[in-house]
């Protein structure tokens, strides 16, 4: 998922970069995926590479997927770095800070996770444990309880 604004440039860059790759048909950029389509795409993935927004981490953990997170730099978004490292501390992801991100480093981490299935499975298992499956219900109950306490 590239975002609509970047879709055409990512599509063209991928076409050129993957032109001679026999697996190029497996790469499918999308400008936007609705929540159901995103969940279905994630279901087919063994590894998710994403930014580190709280919504992204919540989705990845609910899917129980191994991930590599690249947080937006702190000068742009202070919370993404903290989110990423909290998730990594739970054993659920690999973090590559944007300033350290190179194609070789990213490819090295991807290869490491695919040549070491146990590492990938451990990340996925930790992601499942991190997920708060009933968070929406608990939040709604807390809001209702607070509202009832202040009813007046």
Each language-model region and where it sits:
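A donor-sugar binding/catalytic signature common to diverse glycosyltransferases
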Residues: 38-80
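Donor-nucleotide binding loops and adjacent catalytic segments primarily
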Residues: 1-48, 81-85, 89, 96-105
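Hydrophobic beta-strand scaffold residues
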Residues: 67, 94-95
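Receiver (REC) domain switch/output surface
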Residues: 109-113
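A short, well-ordered alpha-helix in the C-terminal region of glycosyltransferases
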Residues: 119-133
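Short histidine/acidic/glycine/proline-rich micro-motifs that form metal-
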Residues: 5, 72-75, 129
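C-terminal alpha-helical cap of glycosyltransferases
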Residues: 132-152
């Amino acid at each position: 998922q590239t975002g609509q604004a970047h879709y055409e440039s990512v599509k063209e860059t991928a076409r050129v970069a993957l032109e001679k790759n026999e697996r190029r048909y497996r790469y499918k950029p999308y400008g936007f995926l609705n929540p159901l389509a995103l969940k279905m795409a994630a279901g087919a993935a063994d590894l998710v590479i994403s930014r580190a927004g709280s919504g992204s981490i919540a989705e990845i953990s609910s899917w129980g997927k191994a991930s590599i997170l690249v947080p937006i730099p702190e000068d742009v978004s202070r919370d993404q770095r903290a989110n990423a490292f909290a998730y990594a501390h739970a054993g659920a992801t690999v973090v590559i800070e944007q300033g350290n991100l190179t194609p070789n480093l990213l490819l090295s981490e991807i290869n490491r996770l695919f040549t070491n299935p146990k590492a990938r499975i451990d990340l996925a298992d930790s992601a499942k444990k991190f997920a708060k499956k009933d968070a929406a219900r608990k939040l709604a109950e807390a809001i209702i309880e607070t509202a009832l306490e202040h009813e007046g």
